[in-house]
Amino acid sequence: MNGTEGNNFYIPLSNRTGLARSPYEYPQYYLAEPWQFKLLAVYMFFLICLGFPINGLTLLVTAQHKKLRQPLNFILVNLAVAGTIMVCFGFTVTFYTAINGYFVLGPTGCAIEGFMATLGGEVALWSLVVLAVERYIVVCKPMGSFKFSASHAFAGCAFTWVMAMACAAPPLVGWSRYIPEGMQCSCGPDYYTLNPEYNNESYVLYMFICHFILPVTIIFFTYGRLVCTVKAAAAQQQESESTQKAEREVTRMVILMVLGFLIAWTPYATVAAWIFFNKGAAFSAQFMAVPAFFSKTSALYNPVIYVLLNKQFRNCMLTTLFCGKNPLGDDESSTVSTSKTEVSSVSPA
């Protein structure tokens, strides 16, 4: 055994060394040099300083500008809410624990932090799925003409929270558990142990299949079909400037959406899967810590991709930041509502 399992923790260091200590009671400087914990704290502070203003500004701008309160934008706001949850209840806790060098908030704090971080990440992921399905239905028209209404948007938002709770809540009630991971400064589901008391293996398989592989498959399928449909429409209207512009916008958005998600979450999912299928194998604290903390950057990717690339959102943000005047001089009233809505107009009849 190359790790030490204790009460609600697993340390990737054999107890034969005599160094392993509870991550709830002692600094974990035997796992990594103190400067690495300080560097981690600086990194989390950086994410907090960027993540909270970006997501908070998204919510503020939407509240101030009625023209942004359109059905499709509800999902974008849902992404900002998820990002805000991750920043407030995940990043701040990790910043505090990294400064101390161990999870000073104890098992209960670990469970809360792990739950909130998982909940925020899953809400964001399933929001992307809802956006993907909406685009597929509106543009590819598998159901004929379809108008995305406010009721559909609210149902989509509710769906994201139900699915996120279905993933994040089980460890709180005994199906698996949240424990410190990596450098023991943040918490996540228990991929590490075979503890039959918590049925860890069944939960991890459920989470990987239903809350990672399934949503990723849906996103790839729907956006793959979307790109093909837009390309076909563009080929039939070679002289249509709006169609060509829509094709470029869709292609750019698809690439950024897929890359943003894969860059943020695939390293973490891959390492977690390796640890799960190789229980007891030797690995360093940094081996899990690096992808775990890198995945947290997704709280920054989403508002940048889904809001800052949206011209109407961008203009409204500038108007809010500059006290009612847009320094770029763009006329908001003439701006197309969203690049996504613009794409709808090029779907084949």
UniProtKB/Swiss-Prot annotation:
Retinal double cone accessory photoreceptor cell outer segments. SUPFAM superfamilies: Family A G protein-coupled receptor-like (SSF81321). It is found in: Membrane. Residues 329-349 are annotated as: Disordered. The chain crosses the membrane at residues 37-61, 74-99, 114-133, 153-176, 203-230, 253-276, 285-309. One of its GO terms (molecular function) is G protein-coupled photoreceptor activity. Residues 62-73, 134-152, 231-252, 310-349 are cytoplasmic. Residues 334-349 have a biased composition (Low complexity). This is Green-sensitive opsin-4. It comes from Danio rerio.
